[in-house]
């Protein structure tokens, strides 16, 4: 993780002080929200969202000496982070060295730029790539996260194997450790707290938030109004909007209600709309990630992706229902997802195939998962005559 001093911390905040705007006059014209006569609470830093990013920001802010408030609209912490696959890119990690894999931050940055069609912000790409190892080390040394010590995997779009994954195979292996660390520092995430408005002064400077405490998702307007002042920064880590069909189809019309989402139910657009109202510079909202490895028989993320990606994509084949291979299984996820969309338009489906001998690495990395997938009939086993 990048070492943040107070100045860097504040200058890097999404909505700290003079927020990144398309122009404060234009944002102001979009409709001002009246400031409260009195603030109910004041903190140095107020963080919205309790996924990986929000919790990490809270930990570092607290360690830097700030008073911290963390808000989460759902009843439980973690957002999408807690239900993801627990995978982390860790260029230069011990697992890579154990397997003799040559890698570098420069190669990671190159892969990111290629996968992003060079639409990425090069400075941010470099920041991520240069700190991939320190990020991994922070989760291990600071939080005590446990990763599989022997396994290293190769995601689509990456030139070499460079991802590690938590021992429990879930993002909860990271989130739970972040929550533990935060509580040791004296900060508890405030769940069921809905952010209604970002509050600013006449110059456009962010002063704090209007929230609803005791909010009951998805019941609009539930909860008690409270005003929280942020003396130094409001940090927005509220995640995506893929569960909001109306909003996502405004961005990408092909992503209709016919398509399910792997996101948790609270991945909706309220704060995307609110930050747009105040003029925050939102970039590439219509570049919505579609995952190519999920099983349509499962709801949400499920577990079928483990076979499709960590099994068949790395050690087998993806074919269409006509038996023809249709894509490079280790292409980036957009290339693969787009190829599946084409198949869908042709009335075909994608099938992930792998021979059992080739699944040895998968079984070693995720003990018991293959049997679980078979028992739940998420995958099928065929024996040659």
What label would you give each PLM region?
Residues 216-223, 229-299:
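Glycine-rich loop(s) and the adjacent beta-strand/alpha-helix scaffold that form part
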Residues 130-225, 231, 245-247, 295-296:
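Conserved redox-cofactor binding core of oxidoreductases
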Residues 90-128:
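Glycine-rich active-site loop/strand segments that organize a redox cofactor
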Residues 39-51:
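Beta1/beta-strand and adjacent pyrophosphate-binding region of the FAD-binding site
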Residues 54:
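N-terminal Rossmann-fold NAD(P) dinucleotide-binding loop
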Residues 1-16:
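N-terminal secretory signal peptides and thylakoid transit peptides that target proteins
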Residues 64-81:
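Glycine-rich FAD pyrophosphate-binding loop
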Residues 272-274, 281-385:
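An anion/pyrophosphate-binding glycine-rich loop and adjacent beta-alpha core
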């Amino acid at each position: 993780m990048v070492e943040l001093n107070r100045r860097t911390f504040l200058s890097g905040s999404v909505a700290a002080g003079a927020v990144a705007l398309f122009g404060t006059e234009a944002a102001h014209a979009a409709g001002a929200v009246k400031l409260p006569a009195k603030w109910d609470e004041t903190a140095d830093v107020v963080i919205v969202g309790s996924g990986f990013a929000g919790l990490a920001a809270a930990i570092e802010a607290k360690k830097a000496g700030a008073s911290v408030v963390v808000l989460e609209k759902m009843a439980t912490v973690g957002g999408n982070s807690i239900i993801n696959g627990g995978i982390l890119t860790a260029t230069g990690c011990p697992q890579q060295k154990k397997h003799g894999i040559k890698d570098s931050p420069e190669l990671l940055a190159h892969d990111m730029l290629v996968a992003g069609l060079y639409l990425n912000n090069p400075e941010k790409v470099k920041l991520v790539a240069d700190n991939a190892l320190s990020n991994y080390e922070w989760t291990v040394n600071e939080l005590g996260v446990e990763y599989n010590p022997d396994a290293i995997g190769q995601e689509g779009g990456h030139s070499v194997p460079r991802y590690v994954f938590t021992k429990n195979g879930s993002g909860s292996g990271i989130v739970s450790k972040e929550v533990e660390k935060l509580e040791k520092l004296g900060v508890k995430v405030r769940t069921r707290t809905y952010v209604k408005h970002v509050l600013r002064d006449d110059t456009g400077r962010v002063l704090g938030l209007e929230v609803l405490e005791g909010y009951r998702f998805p019941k609009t307007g539930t909860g008690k109004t409270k005003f929280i002042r942020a003396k130094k920064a409001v940090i927005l880590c509220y995640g995506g909007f893929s569960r909001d069909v109306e909003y996502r189809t405004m961005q990408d019309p092909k992503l209709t209600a016919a398509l399910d989402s792997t996101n948790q139910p609270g991945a909706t657009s309220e704060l995307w709309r609110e930050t747009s109202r105040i003029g925050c510079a939102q970039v590439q909202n219509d570049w919505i990630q579609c995952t190519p490895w999920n099983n349509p028989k499962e709801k949400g993320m499920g577990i079928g992706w483990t076979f499709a990606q960590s099994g068949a994509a790395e050690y087998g084949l993806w074919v269409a229902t006509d038996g023809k291979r249709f894509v490079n299984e280790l292409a980036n996820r957009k290339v693969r997802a787009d190829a599946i969309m084409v198949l869908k338009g042709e009335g075909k489906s994608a099938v992930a195939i792998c021979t059992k001998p080739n699944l040895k690495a998968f079984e070693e990395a995720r003990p018991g998962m293959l049997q679980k997938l078979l028992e739940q009939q998420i995958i099928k086993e065929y024996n040659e005559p």
